[in-house]
Amino acid sequence: MQRSPLEKASVVSKLFFSWTRPILKKGYRQRLELSDIYQIPSADSADNLSEKLEREWDRELASKKNPKLINALRRCFFWRFTFYGILLYLGEVTKAVQPLLLGRIIASYDPDNKTERSIAIYLGIGLCLLFIVRTLLLHPAIFGLHHIGMQMRIAMFSLIYKKTLKLSSRVLDKISIGQLVSLLSNNLNKFDEGLALAHFVWIAPLQVALLMGLIWELLQASAFCGLGFLIVLALFQAGLGRMMMKYRDQRAGKINERLVITSEMIENIQSVKAYCWEEAMEKIIENLRQTELKLTRKAAYVRYFNSSAFFFSGFFVVFLSVLPYALIKGIVLRKIFTTISFCIVLRMAVTRQFPWAVQTWYDSLGAINKIQDFLQKQEYKTLEYNLTTTEVVMENVTAFWEEGFGELFEKAKQNNNNRKASNGDDNLFFSNFSLLGTPVLKDINFKIERGQLLAVAGSTGAGKTSLLMMIMGELEPSEGKIKHSGRISFCSQFSWIMPGTIKENIIFGVSYDEYRYRSVIKACQLEEDISKFAEKDNIVLGEGGITLSGGQRARISLARAVYKDADLYLLDSPFGYLDVLTEKEIFESCVCKLMANKTRILVTSKMEHLKKADKILILHEGSSYFYGTFSELQNLRPDFSSKLMGYDSFDQFSSERRNSILTETLRRFSLEGDAPVSWTETKKQSFKQTGEFGEKRKNSILNSINSIRKFSIVQKTPLQMNGIEEDSDEPLERRLSLVPDSEQGEAILPRISMINTGPALQVRRRQSVLNMMTHSVNQGQSVHRKTTASTRKVSLAPQANLTELDIYSRRLSQETGLEISEEINEEDLKECFFDDMESIPAVTTWNTYLRYITLHKSLIFVLIWCLVIFLAEVAASLVVLWLLGNTPFQDKGNSTYSRNNSYAVIITNTSSYYVFYIYVGVADTLLALGFFRGLPLVHTLITVSKMLHHKMLHSVLQAPMSTLNTLKAGGILNRFSKDIAILDDLLPLTIFDFIQLLLIVIGAIAVVSVLQPYIFLATVPVIAAFILLRAYFLQTSQQLKQLESAGRSPIFTHLVTSLKGLWTLRAFGRQPYFETLFHKALNLHTANWFLYLSTLRWFQMRIEMIFVIFFIAVTFISILTTGEGEGTVGIILTLAMNIMSTLQWAVNSSIDVDSLMRSVSRVFKFIDMPTEEGKPTKSTKAYRNGQLSKVMIIENSHVKKDDIWPSGGQMTIKDLTAKYIEGGNAILENISFSISPGQRVGLLGRTGSGKSTLLSAFLRLLNTEGEIQIDGVSWDSITLQQWRKAFGVIPQKVFIFTGTFRKNLDPYEQWSDQEIWKVADEVGLRSVIEQFPGKLDFVLVDGGCVLSHGHKQLMCLARSVLSKAKILLLDEPSAHLDPVTYQIIRRALKQAFADCTVILCEHRIEAMLECQQFLVIEENKVRQYDSIQKLLNEKSLFRQAISHSDRVKLFPHRNSSKYKSQPQIASLKEETEEEVQETRL
């Protein structure tokens, strides 16, 4: 970034904002890069501002029992706020004085007042000087207030972020991500621009009092008629506002429903295509859209009348003020024109400025109170560690996640002790205690010595993660003692990847040790993965490790924990995403060898891990079921297998957690997070649902990204659980959009209660967030000294061979710390923003306007009609002026003022009636025409929005996956949320306002030009100057706005990243570093926003300067060319003053229109996406006719109509090559094999080898080459829809959309209830559905949060059975299941798909044993394709992965004694199946 010219700018340059000229010139000539943006002034840095406010807030906390945040803000900003308020008031006062001089100028034309005529020229000079003074006062004042608002926002942003990192986990349990984002965006954004209006809460009343005094002097009591009307008008507008809010609230629920379905569709677009559900989803969404648009039109009409009321109120104000006076004393033109000018100012003060100011204070104080409450939340407390101990000890530890239960626990226990003394009832305590809440851990005792390995196992929800959280201090014990040395390293069960390089993620701020680093890389099996990257371990990872597989993310997280030199290592199910072979190698080389001398606590349930552990702790429902060695476990607890049921590899996922609230860390951010709800909780929350989707969505966030969802940071209590749980293998950033898309656009959908402006939700970015905030600094003090900005030292390891693509800016200090400079790596930033900025021009093209206007044929006629009415209005106005100029006047004796009978100044009583009749008649006609003009325009523009939404939805659904893979999910969602909201809400009325203002200006200029043709000569160059200045400014401002909008992304993304890894951050003590990164993100945004505000003020000031010149010309032309006794000067000057404010408003509206039209450009970009080939046309035609066929009819000349295809399920694959995007690297190369009908084939390969990719290639979801045949029919000779219908799919990412059970099973409504129940019975789903009220009509929300992952997979099975598929594709169906539920699915597979071809991708060996053939994929190619016997006889990957016990299961005859126990375990599983059916929810 460049150094800001502001630092060296002169006072004059600062006053006129001339220092922004270089960036304006550069932006006009070329596209702006981030390197062109100026550095922020040091006073605006987040470090300085946050430190200042934090100091005052701490002072407030220390000095008062009831601290007020507003007091801290007052001490920081009050005097500057007051100073700019006084400037603003003085500027507003000049507006009230201007009409006085205007009246004197008109009065100077009175023939009897010759003395005044001589000073008219001086009065004109004074009037012009008032405009100059007003310009010099208002713009610095407005900019100063915007600047203060920006500083307040930055300081509070930082304060909130710092507080977030300190919040206790119990508080986090009650706060959703959506609430935090709303706190940062919706609330704090009010300060930036709203602060400039705050002073009008006292300025407007003073101004009204001054104006009424001046009007009273002119019109006496008549003055209050106009004021009364304005007050009534303000109340009327308030009433319209309430009505509009009612419609908006109703509409927000409908929007939420649509966006929920749309979000689910986008996130699961691959499943939608695999199931051939494109038309079904389109119909569902369009039906919701239709209902939404009815309310949209009502709200738009109310807003239209509200806006029109302001435009058309001017006539009534003047009319009501002047009429009583004119009827009594006649019309005095001087007083009329002066009153008109006063009323213009008065109308603005009463109907706009004061209501806006009141609303600003209301919103601001509300936001401050919310932030104040947040800042007083309970903070995380670190445990007091015993640094002398070497062991880890827990003694009688009991804990609750629910806040306050600890105190109740002690009280109940005390009462229990008192009662036991009297009645001896030992069980009384826990009978009382059950009323208080369930402890997540009860009476836990264990002791492990230094260097020992403790394996913690247990069933789902047993409290294993809570145990680790207790040791880390995240969960406070209600009773008992915990002792350990305090140096802890932690690996979360959900792999958390910090945006940065692989090396930075592993080192994570610890001093760099090459030998240790290489040892950890090797032990965690990362060497091979890293070697595949061109940049090796310096490759930049996206947010959440978007470019990595789940297994790679898990190994990096484990490596981070192992690299840190600690006394105690807490490993929470670190092997979740690893294949069997990799897991085995890492456990041996890393956990058992590399960490052999360290104390380790490992959450696991694998038998091999339990055997190697020094001690084993088995938890069951929060209690210690067993503690001891493995041999003791076998002797004392022979039934321990049943306690591990429902666990196995499922442990690392939160899908089935039922009891504890926070035990599964950041549940909503898990890659496979289902709703952890118990059956009792299900009844509390889910049985209240109705058929209306919106009933359970009162607190949803509409992502604008995002994402339309309320993501809880932790699992919420049953009454709070309104969030959405995702079954997603995709990283979070593919689903969660927390920041606005970088494209320009102001409107979004924040909360369900209101549609307003604010940030929209956005998704993953290609580059690291740290790219946005840091820049490499060469080693050496000399370079560092060149950086004038402040630096902040944080701990981070240095690296050798730094390149300019490095994320961190670093300098090795003696304390192995890091100096992060304020410099930004522009190249990385440019690359990071490239996606958002490309292919959207800085200024909306004329082609976009033309395409938008011609989209609906009625729109052109409406615009022509508007022009015709405008011409009629101008003609009527000229007629009125002609009548005024030619009104006959009475004799001198009959005139009101006997000394004057000139029509230029006085019109008599008799003529006044005549004039007013004409004026009122014409004005009423114009009002009626005006309303008639606007309504059709607004109505038609909403219809255009409807068409654009339909076209875009259709294009997205029909786009190939290769195209969709290049887009960000949040970016797509923003089109349907933010951009459609702009098209619905803002664009129609903004276009109406612009057209209205433009016509007013043109009409005023036309009238003035008719009265004084010389003025027209002055008008032409002024209008030309306006157009050129607008074009010059717009080119730069839109780019700055685009950069500013993109600059918001790192702020919210960094917040989410920090929250996702909050426990890891605390365990590693990295809060200060992440605070620094957050300040970097804030400073980046501030640089763009401050420059945008400055250039905007430059533009506004130039507009005023041009007008001042124009007004000077008009004033002197009028004074010098108006002859004796003519009164047209009053009309000319009054209209000229009106032109000033209206033309500025019109120019600003044109800029708003251009900004909002960028949303149209983005929508057109999506509409123009390519479509998949082979799309049947019959269904499309049926849809266009408003009817959606229940059965899709596809003609295929290669298949006889009498045949049922596919009949057997035989597959032949020849030279299959697959790529994710056109021109990308091949993921699979030259795959060839064949599958016999009814055969079961297992896919084997290491993590990331391409197993899931092969299944996607079968469905033609990727760019593929080669050939596949099913029963002799090639995929090239059949339509895409029919090809996909041949497959049944159970994907990793189970798709349950918001809708009934029936709709989820049969979206095309092809099957009767009897057929659906029959299939549900076949797959074991009937008992699940019957437990819900409404059964098939029960509405599933939040991704089916009331269902376990196993039940969701059963629904996928049911869909496949209903589709009559002959080939079934299963992608790791057991990855998130306990063995019991998986047994149910295996049984369903055997029964429902006995004669089908099954292709299974699975990590669990037991699940693969039923396959006849195995396809081993290695290095993107087929390595082996053989039966299981051949693979076991060779040194294959399968043989390495399978354990001896699994081989015994395969060949029981080789060792019958070892196999005897198998039937017992199998029978145990069978016994529990029915129990699972009843309790699995």
Curated annotation (Swiss-Prot):
Superkingdom assignment: Eukaryota
The protein's enzyme class: isomerase
Source organism per UniProt: Aotus nancymaae (Ma's night monkey)
Gene coding for it: CFTR
Protein name, per record: Cystic fibrosis transmembrane conductance regulator
UniProt cross-references to PANTHER family, sorted A to Z: ATP-BINDING CASSETTE SUB-FAMILY C, CYSTIC FIBROSIS TRANSMEMBRANE CONDUCTANCE REGULATOR
Cytoplasmic topology ranges: 1-77, 147-195, 244-298, 359-858, 940-990, 1035-1095, 1152-1481
Catalysed reactions, as listed in the record: ATP + H2O + closed Cl(-) channel = ADP + phosphate + open Cl(-) channel; chloride(in) = chloride(out); hydrogencarbonate(in) = hydrogencarbonate(out); ATP + H2O = ADP + phosphate + H(+)
Entry comment on modification after translation: N-glycosylated.
PTM annotation (Phosphothreonine): residues: 717
